[in-house]
Every structure is written in structure tokens, then in C-alpha cells.
């Protein structure tokens, strides 16, 4: 098996603050507690620089270097991550949750993290057809490319 050399007992879970990722996080925590496994919550984020402004017919020239995110932007993402964890776990979870904030596309970040895991858990928004093709599917990419088993969790339906 491709994942046999990975650290024993590591579960990676993708987190983005959505109800689906909250459900995945709770499921992964329960599974980690059952397996006595290490739980790594991964939040992938991308920096999108603001578009330079120019008058019609002019070439836009950025006023500053947008090659990376500022500390304030990173701090805002870290706060979103912590809020998502607090929302998923109103009380202390049964396992320690290692937090990992990684800059990059979620699908590829989770694929890379899967190389060091025995199990990856992701949420699914349930998109299919054209919506999935146009918007992409992180869960599908991870299922197709991870070298270890992947569990896809849907958020419970209200009602």
C-alpha cells in the first residue's frame, strides 16, 4: 500500500468553515478517538491580490508588490480557522487537534498532506454535474489522488 510508510495513526481532515467541513471535523475527531490516532486539521487558503485599477485604455500598474499575503490577512485566516474549530467543538474534543494552516489550493494541499496520513476526511457540498465541473470538487480530487483511504462526509440535513 502506498500509505504504509506514513506515520501510524494519522488522520488528516480538511477544514474551511463550511457546515460540511464542520461535520467532517467532528467525524474525524470521533474516529481519531476510537483509533487513538493523531488528528491534523488542515485549512488551505489562497491569497488573491486586489486587481490594479486603471482608467479605460491605460495599462494597470500595481502600486505595490502583491506576491504574498500580509500578516493581517494571515491573521484573519487564522481567526477563521479557530472560529471553525470552536464551532465544531463547543466543548473540548476527546482528542488533541493539531492545526495546520497552508497557503495553496485546497485540493492540492490535501493531496500533499495525504502522503503523511493513514486516512483523509473531507466534507462534501454535494455538487454534481455542471456545478461540480465548473466549480471543481475538492473531495473528488482528494478521492482520486490521495494515496490513502478517504472518507467523504456530508453535513446532516436540517429537518
Name each model-derived stretch.
Residues 90-98:
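A short helix-to-beta-strand connector/capping loop
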Residues 61-79:
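A short acidic, glycine-rich active-site loop
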Residues 29, 74-81, 106, 115-119, ...:
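Conserved N-terminal glycine/acidic-rich loop preference
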Residues 119-144, 155, 159:
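Glycine-rich, Arg-bearing micro-motifs that act as flexible, cationic patches
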Residues 105-110, 138:
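Short acidic active-site motifs
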Residues 35-38, 95, 119, 148:
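Short glycine/serine/threonine/alanine-rich loop segments
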Residues 2-65, 113, 117, 158:
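Small/aliphatic-rich secondary-structure junction motif
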Residues 40-42, 98-102, 151:
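General small-molecule cofactor/ligand-binding pocket signal
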Amino acid at each position: 500500500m502506498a500509505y504504509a510508510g506514513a506515520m501510524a495513526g494519522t488522520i488528516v481532515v480538511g477544514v474551511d468553515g463550511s457546515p460540511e467541513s464542520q461535520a467532517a471535523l467532528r467525524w474525524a475527531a470521533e474516529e481519531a478517538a476510537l483509533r487513538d490516532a493523531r488528528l491534523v486539521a488542515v485549512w488551505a487558503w489562497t491569497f488573491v491580490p486586489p486587481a490594479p485599477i486603471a482608467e479605460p485604455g491605460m495599462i494597470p500598474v500595481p502600486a505595490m508588490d502583491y506576491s504574498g499575503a500580509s500578516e493581517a490577512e494571515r491573521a484573519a485566516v487564522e481567526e477563521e480557522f479557530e472560529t471553525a474549530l470552536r464551532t465544531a467543538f463547543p466543548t473540548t474534543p476527546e482528542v488533541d487537534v493539531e492545526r495546520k494552516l497552508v497557503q495553496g489550493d485546497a485540493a492540492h494541499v490535501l493531496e500533499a498532506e495525504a502522503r503523511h496520513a493513514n486516512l483523509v476526511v473531507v466534507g462534501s457540498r454535494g455538487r454534481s454535474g455542471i456545478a461540480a465541473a465548473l466549480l471543481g470538487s475538492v473531495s473528488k480530487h482528494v478521492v482520486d489522488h490521495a494515496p490513502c483511504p478517504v472518507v467523504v462526509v456530508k453535513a446532516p440535513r436540517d429537518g
